[in-house]
Curated annotation (Swiss-Prot):
Family note: Belongs to the universal ribosomal protein uS4 family.
Entry keywords, A to Z: Mitochondrion, Ribonucleoprotein, Ribosomal protein, RNA-binding, rRNA-binding
Naturally occurring in which organism (per UniProt): Arabidopsis thaliana (Mouse-ear cress)
Superkingdom per UniProt: Eukaryota
UniProt-recorded name of the protein: Small ribosomal subunit protein uS4m
Note: A stretch of 270 kb of the mitochondrial genome is duplicated within the centromere of chromosome 2 resulting in the duplication of the gene. The expression of this duplicated gene (At2g07734) is not demonstrated. It is also probably not RNA edited and therefore differs in all the positions known to be edited.
Oligomer and partners: Component of the mitochondrial ribosome small subunit.
Start and end residues of each S4 RNA-binding domain: 105-179
Pfam families in the cross-refs: S4
């Protein structure tokens, strides 16, 4: 009996070793950004920090070292199994920015920045299952460092499914949450649907055709095409800059706010009401390591209110993405390279279902 209990205890202790690393993460890897264990660690770290500040047991020197250890643990939660000794390697280091930029060149992190996948555990799972290629070769190392000019692609059998999932999530996130959610207060019959109804509609061909025929989306598309023409006249070729945030999301929101602002001004002119000259909300971000603080104004229907926004950005990598294939080319530094001959740049012109079944560019 004692021997049987001992064997059962040994099997329980060694049970995690039988599974892969992705299976050790509790919860649904595909839908959660942090697992239950990771959230518990973060909660304990926050409670520990508050208790130290309240009791004032340690001196300021020990408190700062403890906060540094906290930040390394939080970084390891995001970037995976991160060795803490690597953070403290070298006494001449004055900043952690080069270290963070080095972490941003990892294969799993770049897949997340590309918005090919939603979470880093999801990216690690695909890499470990050998589904993603670098320069047409299979890579199964999650912390693989990508160099300048590397081409990221999926296998042929997995590329079509992955491309459809990316496009559907892209349209759900932009059109349902960002655009349609803003226009629900307008008396338009088409937009007065609940969020779940739009999620179900965008999965079908009928919903995509209904969205393509909308006058609002056609106006938004024409304004963005005019912007592209002006950009090509200035710089000579189409270029897309994607960093830690999705640049096209910001661009669509900016055009949306601009169109709403212009329609508001037209209504005020028709009513012969005195209007204030207020510029629309525009965020100007520079490509330096620490971008300058920018100014923005309030919405047109409010009083003029000037706010100062302080922003710190890390321009780590610039990517040229094709969401139809899907493929991407990695470029580091402030300059974006030229588009290769075998990749067509489809930044916003993603594929939607149409009547002929091949799709229609939006």
């Amino acid at each position: 009996m004692w021997l049987l209990k001992k064997l059962i205890q040994r099997d329980i202790d060694l049970s995690p070793l039988r599974f892969q690393t992705c299976r050790l993460l509790l919860g649904n890897v595909w839908n959660r950004e942090l697992t239950i264990i990771q959230r518990r660690i973060l909660r304990r770290l926050r409670n520990r920090k508050r208790s130290i500040k309240k009791r004032k047991i340690y001196s300021k020197k020990y408190l700062t070292s403890y906060i540094q250890l906290q930040t390394t643990r939080k970084l390891s939660l995001f970037y995976g199994d991160l060795p803490i000794t690597e953070m403290h390697r070298g006494t001449k280091r004055t900043s952690y920015i080069p270290f963070l930029l080095n972490l941003e060149t990892r294969f799993d992190v770049i897949l997340l920045r590309l918005h090919f996948l939603e979470t880093i555990p999801q990216a690690r799972q695909l890499i470990s299952h050998r589904r993603v290629c670098v320069n047409k070769g299979m890579v199964s190392i999650t912390h693989f460092k990508l160099s300048h000019g590397d081409i990221i692609s999926f296998q042929e059998n997995n590329a079509i499914i992955r491309g459809e999932e990316i496009r559907r999530s892209f349209y759900k996130e932009i059109l349902v949450e960002k655009i349609i959610g803003k226009l629900l207060h307008q008396p338009l019959r088409m937009w007065r649907r609940s969020k779940t109804e739009w999620f179900h509609l965008l999965k079908t061909k009928r919903g995509c055709r209904l969205l393509l025929k909308s006058r609002f989306l056609q106006q938004l598309r024409s304004s963005m095409q005019e912007e592209d023409l002006e950009r090509t006249k200035k710089f000579g070729s189409e270029k897309v800059c994607l960093g830690s945030s999705f640049a096209e999301h910001k661009r669509m929101k900016r055009n949306l706010l601009k169109s709403l602002f212009l329609s508001k001004r037209r209504k005020d002119k028709n009513l012969n009401l005195p209007t204030r000259t207020i510029s629309p909300i525009v965020y100007n971000s520079s490509l330096s390591l620490y971008s300058n603080s920018t100014y923005c104004f309030a919405s047109p229907h409010k009083l003029t209110m000037k706010r100062r926004i302080k922003r710190i950005e890390l321009p780590t990598h610039y990517l040229e993405v094709n969401y139809r294939t899907p493929k991407a080319v990695v470029f580091y530094g402030p300059n974006i390279g030229h588009i290769p001959h075998d990749i067509r740049l489809k930044d916003l012109n993603l594929l939607l279902w149409s009547r002929n079944g091949r799709g229609q560019n939006i």
